[in-house]
Amino acid sequence: MKRILLMVLRNLFFVPYGWFKLCWYASHVDRYTEEERYRLLQYVDHRAIRGGNLKIDAHGLENIPKENGFMFFPNHQGLFDVLAIIQVCPVPFSVVAKKELSDVPFLKHVFACMKAFSMDREDIKQSMQVILKVIKEVKQGRNYLIFAEGTRSKDGNHPQEFKSGSFKAATKSQCPIVPVALIDSYKAFDTGSIKKLTVQVHFLKPMYYEEYKDMKTTEIAAEVKRRIEETIQRNIEK
């Protein structure tokens, strides 16, 4: 990953300090408020993004609910997705990530700071326990992000099927569902290029409980995907 190396080289003097502080916060999460941990992540993220020839172009920030206790559902393009959203989202959120990412350097510390949940897709019982915990925390006012595709798309800006089960936490907690359209996020780490790159993050209008309460989760999944796909097609560079 040439761009990650570029991020490190351009932040050579910052890396020891930033890495130590990130590890410290990740190991002592209960000493800091969620707001404090999130602002640290944004600061470290900003340094990495600037060093990596990246720019995040955010749209629809006004669509993020004013009250906490909502869920983001973005399309999934790659390892940079969460970092792109962290950089431009003004309010803290946590993540439900697949178990494999808990061993990825840097990301595992980011997720620790966010008090994220790791889900083992092969273990139904563990997955259900995670969903129940997310429901409880969303009802208590925490915000979460789930990638409804389950795994990143291998087709760039073309999302895969959105899995209906990913929306159970939202429907059970009756929270606002915020679709998020990511454009060109996969190019950050997955193409081998270090050219200047703009990643687009579009926060779409939320679906509130009154809108989806009579819909099946399969219908919700299809509608969220449709809105994201339409946004990508309107904004993608031909």
Task: Outline where the language-model segments fall.
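Residue-level "edge-of-site" marker
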Residues: 61-62, 124, 183
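Non-catalytic C-terminal accessory region of glycerolipid acyltransferases
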Residues: 4, 128-238
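Short acidic-hydrophobic, aromatic-tinged amphipathic segments that line or gate anion-handling sites
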Residues: 58, 117-120, 209
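Amphipathic coiled-coil/heptad-repeat helices and related helical stalk/stem segments
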Residues: 57, 78, 103, 127-131, ...
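Membrane-anchoring hydrophobic helices of lipid-metabolizing enzymes
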Residues: 1-70
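Catalytic core of membrane glycerolipid acyltransferases/transacylases, capturing the structured
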Residues: 21-25, 37, 51-52, 66-124
